[in-house]
Amino acid sequence: MMTPEFFMEIEKKTFSPYAQLTSASKGRERPEETSPVRTAYQRDRDRIIHSKSFRRLMHKTQVFLSPVDEHYRTRMTHTLEVTQIARIVARALRLNEDLTEAIALGHDLGHTPFGHAGEEALRTCYDPTFRHAKQSLRVVDRLENDGEGLNLTFEVRDGILNHSGKALAATLEGRIVKFADRIAYINSDIDDAIRGGILSLSDIPSDLLEILGEGYSERINRMVLSLVEGSTDKNEIVMTEPVGEATERLRAFLTDRVYINSAAKSEEHKAKDLLVSLYGYYIDRPDELPPLYRRIAEEDGIKTSVADFISCMTDRYAVDLFRRLFIPDVWRGGAV
């Protein structure tokens, strides 16, 4: 039988000197018995995959709000794309693929319904510093497993928290996920924007297409190769130039043309208003919260509890709940 000790010996013999060894993990906040067949990071990965928050990602917006066309990305498909890219890079660099996979699978667990519109709604009504990365950590630490949390290792928790923004993860594996996230959403969002008629390939600056490629697969391959070449035998994760600079310019282009000013964003104000209304409703009626969130309200405060409840909703659940709470139902009484 291949035991965790067997895998950890292989790590010591084959991994890069810059890799995070499983045997060197800082461990969990609550000590546990070890598994006879899985390493700590493999167990973290499995806990995330089997969590309710992970399953809900399939019904959360990536860019397009609740699209009718089922070919548009969701938070779930985005997460799987990030995971695939991150694993390729980690393997090529001889880093810890299990750790990388666990971070990638968990990085968006705390994302709100309606994508970044939901995040902005909670910044408005709850906390100006609300970030989905911080909420993702709260999900795995506090909300999952009926309020007990998943008790993940320090390195996975750190990678989830620091997958976005300026802060760097403590491990190279966590830093890979930050780049994989960008590579995935840049290219999938272009693909979805073209599908939705919001963007055409000719709209993208020609010099960027020349550097990065015109096709979806070509761009991903060039970005991944740039990341691997720039990071090989180094204690950092970086892209080579000119691909790195072109990637950032392409991201800025998408921010202006898709994320802020496109027709896909025309309904976002409704999504924000919907979530703000739900937040206000439950702030005034905490007794109507589900049992878990009533308990959290007693321990962490009502504002935090309501924000937790809302951030865990799917797009569909939020819309249905709003309709039930605020839209009068049709009278179905008998005829006079």
What are these model-predicted stretches?
Residues 1-75, 79, 83-89, 96-97, ...:
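Histidine-centered, transition-metal-coordinating active-site segments
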Residues 98-125:
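Aspartate-rich (DDxxD/NDxxD/DxxxD) Mg2+/diphosphate-binding motifs
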